[in-house]
Structures are given as C-alpha cells and as structure tokens.
C-alpha cells in the first residue's frame, strides 16, 4: 500500500499517515503481519494474510474499505492510500519500448506509445494485469520568475488558483423541457498550450495580464521524474503483462508475441519494441526436463523389472505402470490439481512406489499358480490375504506425505503438489493392483504353472541366506550392528550445513543498489549508466535492464518489489547466455562493484527458491525510542560486519538524512501578515510546484503545475531570497526576513512491524554462501555480547531473528504441526491391520531408522540439509514403513515363521518377499536416477537422499526387522491378540 505525502519527513509520515492506517487495518483479523516504512514523502505498508485465508479477494475488499474510511482523517496533502494487490505474482511477458535514433530520446513520445502498447496487451485474450515501468509522467509546466511574480503581488499558489479557475472543463447543469434534456457546458477548456497562454491573470494592483506574458509554458515529463528505466544504457519504458491463472502459458505468450509484432510494425521511425522476458520458454524447458526424467525413469524401472522378475511378471507389472499413471492424471482435474513441474516430479518420485503394490500382487498370484490353483481361486485367495495389508501399507505411506499436503503458507504451496501427486499415484496403484493385475494374471501368469522355473542358485543368494541365518541366530547382535548406521547418521546431523531452499537455476540475476537516502534520482540515474556499462562488458551478459526510483518488474516469483518512490534505489536485471555464465560472473561482480562504487551499497543476488525474504540474515530490534534503536542497530551491524561471508550490512533507522530547517521568527512572521501554514504553503509551492488543473489533449489529461524556474529550485542558497506575498506586504518579503535556515540531520526511514517500531539490521552474503552458517555465527556472537555486557538491551526492548532463518523455522514448524496427529493415525492404521501393538512397534521403529538412513545418505551426497530434504526424508519413512509392513505380513502368513522357526523365516525372507523388497527398492531408486543427475540444485539433493536412503533402508528390512520380529513376536507365541 502506498500513501504519498509530498514534502513530509519520516517522523511526520509515521505519526500522521502510517499509524492511523495501521490502527484501521489491525481491526481485520485475517492480517497476520503488518509492516510500514515511512520514508521522506511516502508511507509504504505491506501486509501478510494468515495462512488460513484461501480466498483473498474479500479481504482485499475490506482493506480497501478501511483505507477509504481512514483517508478523510489524514492531513491535507496526503494522497489517497492505494492498495496494490496485483503485484504479488510474476509477469508472463515484459517488453521494452526503446529509442533507436542517434538523437536524444523523446520521453513523451515513448510514454505515449508505451501506454498504447499496454492497452493492446490488455486486449490479448486471457490477460489479467498490465503495468508500465520507467514512466516519468507527462505534465505541463508553468515556469515563473519569482522576482517578476513578486512585482505583480502574486504567489505561486495564487497564480495556480487563477489558472484552475479559468478552466472551462466543467458542467453547468441541465435545461429540462417537456421533450428534451440539454446539458449546459462552458467553452474555454484547456486543450492546448495556446489556450493556457491566453488566460487573464489579475494582479494585486488590479491589472490584467496574459499568463504567457509572465510565465514560460512547456509540455514535458515531470522534473524530477518519479522513475526512470534504461535498456542497455538507453532510455526505455517497460510494459509488463500477466496472464490469468489456469491457462497454458505457451499459448498465451504466443498470442502476446503476435500482438507485440503487430505493434512494432505500427511504430514510427525512432521507436522499436523489444521483448526482454517471457515465462513460456522457462516453463517449457522445465516441463521438458521433468518429462524426459519421467520417461527415463519409466524405462529404467521396466528394464529392472524384466531383469529381476522374469518377462511374464515384469510385463504384468509393466502394464500396471502406465495404467496407474493415466489414472493418476485422470484424477488431477476432479481434485483441482494442475500438471506442472511439482506434480510431474511427484509422479517421478512415485514411480517406484506405484509398482510396489503391483509387484506384491503379481508375486502372490504367481506363487499360487505354481501351487496349482486356478485363476479364480488364486485371485480370490490373493485378494483375501493382501487387500488389507496393501491398504494399510498404502495408507501409511500416504499419511507420511500428508503433512506436506496439509502444510499452510508459501512453502506448503510450493511443495504441496508434489506430495499430493504421490498420494494420488499411491491410491491409483492400489486400485490397479486389485483390479487390473488380477485381470491380466490368467493371460500372463497362469502359464507359469505348466513350466515351473528351475530353482537357480548363485554365490550372492547363498551369501544373502547365510547372512540372514546369522541374523536370526543372533538377533540382538544383528539389531545393534544395524542400529549403528541410523544412530550414527542422527548423531552427525549437527555437522550438516543448512539451507532453506537452494538457489534457482536461472540465466538471470539481479543487482540492488542503494545510495544515501538524500540522493536525487538524477544522481542515481548517473550511477545506473556507469553500473550498466560495467556489467555489459562481462562475458556472457546478453542484456541489462535498469530501473531507477522503483523496483524492477517481477520476472521471478519470489522477488520483493517494495521500493516505489525511492529516488536513491537502483534495481538491475541482468540476462546471461546460460546458468553457467550467471554462476561464473556473480562472485567477481560483487567485488568489482564494491571497489568501483564505494559510495553505493551494491548487492548482487541470484534468484532463490522458496519463500521470499528481505535479506539472508536479519535481526529485528523492537522498541520505542528512535535513538536507542539507532544505537542498537549500529552495534548489531558491527557484529554482522565481523562475519567472514558478509559483504554489506544495513541498519535502516539512522539519523543520516540532511534536512534544511527554517528557524521561523514568529513575531516577524505575524507582523508580515503571515502564518506558519501560509509560509509552508508558499515555500512548498515555490519549490515543489502547485497543481493548477488539467490540460485535455485527445484522451490524455496532463496535469498543470506552476513552479519556479530550475535555478531557484535547485540552489539552496537561493531559498533565502524567496519572496513571500501577503496582504500587508504588497512588494513581497524575502524569506530571510522571517526565518533563518540551517542543515540538521533527520531520520531517513522509520520502520514498524505489527504496530511496533522495529530496527531492521540486514546482512548480505557472498555468492552461494549458506545463510544458516552465518546466522549461527551471528547468534553465537550476539549471545556472547549479551552475556559479557558488550551489548545491553534496555527494558522493553527485544531482538528477534528474521531473514532466511525465520522463514525456515516458520516453514518447518508448519510442516511438523500436523505430524503428531498423523502419526497417531498411522499407528491406528497399522495396529488395526495387524491387531497387534508389537507388530506396530516394529513397523514404526523401522520408520524411525529410515530417518537416520536418510541423514546418512545426505552426508554421503555432501548436500546441505534443507526443506526439500525434510520432505524427502518424510517420504522415505513412509516407504520404509511400507516395506516393513510387507515383511511382517509375510511372516504372519506362514504359521511356522509366526512361531519363530528359523528355517521358515529364512524361507520367507529369501523367497518372494526378498524379491519384492529388492524389486521395489531398485525400481524406486532407478526411477529417481534421472533426477539425481539433473542440472540445478533443487532436485538432485532430494533424489539422492531418497534414493540412497532407500538402499540403506534395506538393511532395516532384511536384518533389523526379522531379528526384532523373532525376539518380540515369535517369542510371545505369535498371537497378535495377546500382544
């Protein structure tokens, strides 16, 4: 939300604008976080809704109502607060209108055609939102000489009032007869500069002069402009457009590109439109990559099935895979799911899992056919024995993924579709295994009875059986040895690096540059040209887009855009030839910018995955006194500067903004017939200008502004000679007669969070550094400083962590919030399936060990522990529980094994059960191989952790579970009802 108050200081903005708006908005219960930033001349507020809100439109309507309610109570001069609820999503396409001639660019012409381009993009079918960037804004300037104006006895405000009063753009009612209605209008509306020049202005002496005789009129862009944009160092105006959600991005972008081509053909000489970004290519590439991974995984899974199960069984399971996939995709639409990167990744993850039920059913039918059962008898017997265990294993695996689906917030929205796709695939797999596999068995499996395979033996099978026999003979020793692996993994967990989400795989990066708060937009633009020139010289850089005074258009989903009306801010978007070029240039560029432009704070940032945050590491200090907050901020900034990977530190609230203060002699002011209010109005009108109506030109309305010539407005020393006009001083009075001026420091910004003042101390890191490492170092330094007295927090002040750490902790907390309830549901499912608490305990002990196996796999891969790793380990636990259920059910099906007979248990493990476990493990691992070797940092760590963790989990399945079963269940007589 933006609430401009031109000329006001941050203290005035906070007290008169930000706090009243906050008080009004805090009555809306759905608002979870409300932040405000009071800068010179503007209040910027941002709000975050509660995760429970799923339909935001009614809330935005209530916010607008609250803003409308509070607007009349705000001081005169505060522009109507505006809610910008359309900026939370990335644009689908961004185009730039650029100047192609060698002559200086014509900003007015560029902005006019940029507006036309915006209109045409808005007409593309499926367009939701458009916006222009780098728009300075056209206006008509009435430039007056203060001495000449003073001689006429007029002030800027009086002249502006005379101009606006002469505008005939008004209605004068209606003439209503019995048969007609006639609207009465006035002639003389402002439709050209010549019309303005002919306005009669009455002086204080009663004379009438033409406006053109006492002022210079010119049409141009606002000076200084509110925003400027550059494309490769040349002036440009950018237009962004976003499609309506739920459409195909490739089809919409194709329509938008056709519109751009048609518009380019209509442009006059000197103008050209250039596409600088479109989302479709990134989406198509990503979907193409994951589709290839899906196909490769499918091929590997089927190939392994043929190697491990024989061609008849493999063909049966192989036919179940596409059937399961098709059923999964068919269920997407009724469930409100879409086909995108995350849902396809979910199907890839489920590839091995979806063959699990089919393998179990196929093996069971095959064994019964070998025993001579008919197809009907074999099917009936297999369904009777396996329907409930398969349902239990499917439900427990689904429940393992359920916390991810139930997780609220941005992180849940990001990974939720992956887990949902896995769950839908598991349900589809269960249905296919019960319906399709038995239907295929008479054709593919019944013939194995006529040709029973000759038993084959080899050294690996003999070694496997020997190891299992030793395990069953010495169960306690086997359990201790097996436990060493997961326990060791959990013990080494503190040594892992932590990363919330990995960096994005993008051939783009962005640079945020901040100058001192008092910097003008002209100074920032000059710096932009230098930075652009330097960046464009780097190898692999294709395009540089610069945005001065405002944030760049969102070209990536989690970039914060809250720098409106900030002349000291520069945002650059750099396009490179490849991801490799981005990774190569970013580290060195950060150092080069710091050395070449020490007057600015330059932060080179790669795009990141997951929830957005303002800075990688952040501390928030809450309190009331600005001086105390400033001092604490500087002390904490000093601690951050000591961290080895920190490049820049910002402590926002500082008294570092120079302010020109007028020390008013109130007696002299009163003697001159002036008040403090009239003095402020005259000085403000002379420096910033005074609105004086609108010039109507075709469909364009250009604001008219009366102001002093540039020399008077840009020279502080000229301020003393400013002439004040009053009824008592006809010839005017110099400002120096009633006030003395001096420079004083003032607050550059005042930030608030949830109705409290907060000092934000933010640290930026070198490229590819892990924020968690630096945050841990900072926490240690902070605790040491608090303990030894180097840093003292006054009563009523507190410090809280922000940045990546806060987002990570919040996301993990939300993920684990529903785990307890779902664990209870899983326990109930397994207990009811086996009618035994001991068997359920075996299952969940195995699941706990799988967690440790996942940590060991992560240690082996060398990746950081992040949010997607947590998601992967939760899935791994579900798979391990599934395998354990199958083994326990197999033991229970054999009367001798249930009683603890070693040979019977060995036969169960080394027979169809081991074939099932091995096939499922290898197929799941094979299905993940394409993701393991994929490019980027998001999916390889996930796939490697799950894949290798699953291989390690077979130790639990083959050694720990049989040993514990023999100790707990078999020794008790094997009766589930008694355990």
What are these regions (language model features)?
Residues 351-365, 387-406, 413-452, 572, ...:
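Transmembrane alpha-helices and their membrane-interface boundaries in multi-pass membrane transporters
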Residues 299-366, 424, 826-935, 948, ...:
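Hydrophobic transmembrane alpha-helices and their membrane-interface caps
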Residues 276, 283, 287, 362, ...:
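Helix-loop junctions and hydrophobic alpha-helical segments within the transmembrane domains
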Residues 384-386, 452-501, 619, 638, ...:
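Signature of alpha-helical transmembrane segments and their immediate interfacial
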Residues 12-86, 147-168, 189, 486, ...:
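Solvent-exposed, membrane-proximal periplasmic/extracellular interface segments of envelope transport
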Residues 2-4, 71, 118-296, 306, ...:
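Extracytoplasmic/periplasmic membrane-proximal domains and adjacent transmembrane bundles
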Residues 35-42, 77-101, 131-137, 176, ...:
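Flexible hinge/switch segments at interdomain interfaces of large molecular machines
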Residues 3-9, 54, 68-77, 333, ...:
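Transmembrane helices with small-residue packing motifs
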């Amino acid at each position: 939300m933006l609430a401009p108050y031109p000329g006001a200081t941050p203290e005035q903005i906070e007290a008169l604008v930000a706090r009243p708006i906050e008080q009004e908005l805090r009555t809306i219960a759905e608002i979870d976080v409300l932040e405000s930033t009071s800068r010179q001349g503007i209040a910027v507020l941002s709000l975050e809704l509660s995760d429970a809100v799923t339909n935001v439109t009614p809330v935005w309507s209530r916010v607008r109502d609250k803003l409308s309610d509070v607007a009349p109570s705000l001081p005169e001069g505060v522009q109507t607060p505006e809610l910008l609820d359309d900026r939370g999503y990335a644009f689908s396409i961004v185009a730039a209108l650029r100047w192609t001639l060698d002559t200086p660019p014509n900003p007015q012409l560029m902005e006019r055609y940029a507006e036309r381009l915006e209109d045409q993009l808005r007409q593309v079918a499926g367009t939701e939102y458009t916006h222009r960037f780098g728009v300075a804004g056209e206006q008509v300037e009435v430039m007056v000489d203060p001495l000449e104006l003073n001689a006429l006895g007029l002030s800027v405000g009086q002249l502006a009032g005379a101009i606006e009063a002469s505008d005939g753009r008004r209605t004068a009612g209606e003439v209503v007869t019995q048969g007609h209605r006639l609207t009465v209008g006035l002639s003389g509306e402002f439709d050209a500069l010549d019309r303005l020049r002919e306005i009669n202005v009455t002086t204080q002496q009663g004379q009438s002069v033409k406006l053109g005789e006492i002022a210079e009129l010119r049409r141009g862009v606002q000076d200084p402009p509110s925003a400027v944009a550059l494309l490769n160092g040349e002036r440009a105006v950018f237009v962004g457009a976003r499609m309506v959600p739920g459409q195909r991005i490739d089809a919409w972008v194709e329509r938008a590109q056709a519109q751009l081509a048609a518009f380019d053909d209509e442009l006059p000489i000197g103008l050209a439109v250039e596409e600088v970004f479109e989302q479709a290519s990134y989406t198509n590439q990503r979907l193409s990559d994951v589709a290839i991974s899906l196909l490769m995984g499918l091929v590997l899974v089927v190939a392994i099935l043929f190697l491990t199960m024989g061609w008849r069984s493999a063909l049966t399971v192989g036919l179940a895979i596409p059937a399961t996939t098709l059923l999964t995709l068919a269920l997407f639409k009724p469930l409100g799911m879409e086909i995108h990167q995350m849902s396809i990744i979910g199907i890839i993850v489920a590839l091995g899992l979806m063959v699990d039920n089919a393998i179990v059913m196929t093996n069971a039918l095959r064994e019964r056919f070998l025993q001579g059962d008919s197809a009907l008898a074999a099917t009936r017997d297999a369904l009777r024995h396996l329907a409930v265990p398969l349902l239990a294993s499917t439900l427990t695996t689904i429940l393992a993924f359920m916390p991810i689906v139930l997780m609220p917030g941005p992180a849940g929205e990001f990974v939720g579709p992956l887990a949902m796709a896995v769950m839908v695939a598991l349900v589809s797999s269960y249905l296919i295994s019960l319906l399709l596999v038995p239907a295929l068995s008479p054709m593919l499996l019944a013939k194995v009875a006529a040709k029973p395979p000759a038993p084959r033996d080899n050294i690996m099978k003999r070694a496997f059986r020997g190891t299992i026999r030793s395990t069953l003979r010495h169960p306690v020793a086997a359990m201790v040895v097996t436990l060493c692996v997961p326990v060791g993994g959990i013990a080494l967990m503190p040594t892992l690096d932590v990363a919330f989400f990995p960096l994005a795989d993008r051939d783009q990066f962005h640079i945020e540059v901040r100058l001192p708060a008092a910097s003008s937009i002209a100074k920032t633009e000059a710096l932009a040209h230098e930075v652009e020139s330097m960046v464009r010289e780097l190898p692999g850089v294709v395009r540089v887009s610069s945005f001065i005074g405002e944030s760049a258009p969102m070209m990536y989903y989690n970039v914060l855009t809250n720098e409106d009306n900030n002349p000291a801010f520069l945002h650059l978007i750099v396009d490179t030839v490849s991801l490799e070029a981005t990774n190569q240039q970013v580290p060195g560029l950060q150092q080069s910018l710091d050395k070449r432009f020490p007057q600015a704070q330059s932060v080179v940032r790669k795009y990141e995955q997951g929830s957005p945050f303002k800075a990688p590491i952040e501390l928030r200090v809450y309190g009331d006194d600005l001086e105390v907050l400033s001092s604490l901020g500087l002390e904490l900034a000093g601690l951050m500067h000591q961290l080895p990977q920190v490049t820049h530190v910002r402590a926002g609230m500082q008294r570092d903004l120079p302010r020109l203060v007028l020390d008013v002699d109130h007696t002299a002011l009163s003697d001159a017939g002036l008040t403090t209010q009239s003095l402020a109005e005259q000085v403000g009108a002379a420096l910033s200008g005074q609105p004086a109506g609108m010039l109507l030109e075709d469909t364009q309305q250009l604001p008219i502004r009366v102001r002093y010539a540039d020399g008077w407005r840009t020279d502080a020393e000229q301020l003393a000679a400013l002439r004040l006009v009053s009824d008592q001083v006809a010839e005017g009075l110099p400002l120096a007669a009633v006030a003395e001026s001096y420079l004083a420091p003032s607050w550059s910004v005042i930030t608030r969070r949830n109705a409290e003042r907060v000092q934000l101390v933010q640290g930026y890191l070198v490229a590819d550094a892990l924020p968690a490492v630096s945050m841990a170092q900072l926490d240690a330094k902070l605790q040491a400083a608090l303990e030894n007295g180097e840093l003292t927090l006054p009563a009523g002040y507190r410090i809280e962590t922000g940045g990546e750490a806060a987002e990570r902790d919040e996301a993990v907390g939300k993920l684990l919030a529903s785990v307890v309830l779902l664990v209870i549901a899983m326990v109930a499912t397994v207990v009811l399936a086996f009618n035994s608490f001991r068997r359920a305990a075996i299952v969940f002990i195995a699941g706990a060990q799988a967690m440790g196996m996942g940590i060991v796999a992560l240690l082996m891969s060398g990746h950081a522990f992040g949010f997607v790793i947590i998601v992967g380990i939760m899935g791994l636990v579900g798979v391990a529980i599934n395998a354990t259920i199958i083994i326990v059910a197999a033991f229970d099906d054999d009367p001798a094994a249930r009683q603890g007979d070693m040979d019977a248990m060995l036969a169960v493990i080394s027979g169809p059960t081991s074939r099932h476990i091995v096939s499922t493990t290898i197929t799941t691992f094979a299905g993940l191989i394409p993701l393991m070797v994929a490019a980027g940092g998001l999916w390889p760590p996930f796939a490697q952790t799950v894949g290798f963790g699953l291989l390690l989990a077979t130790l639990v399945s083959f050694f720990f579970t049989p040993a514990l079963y023999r100790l707990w269940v078999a020794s008790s007589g094997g009766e589930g009802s008694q355990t």
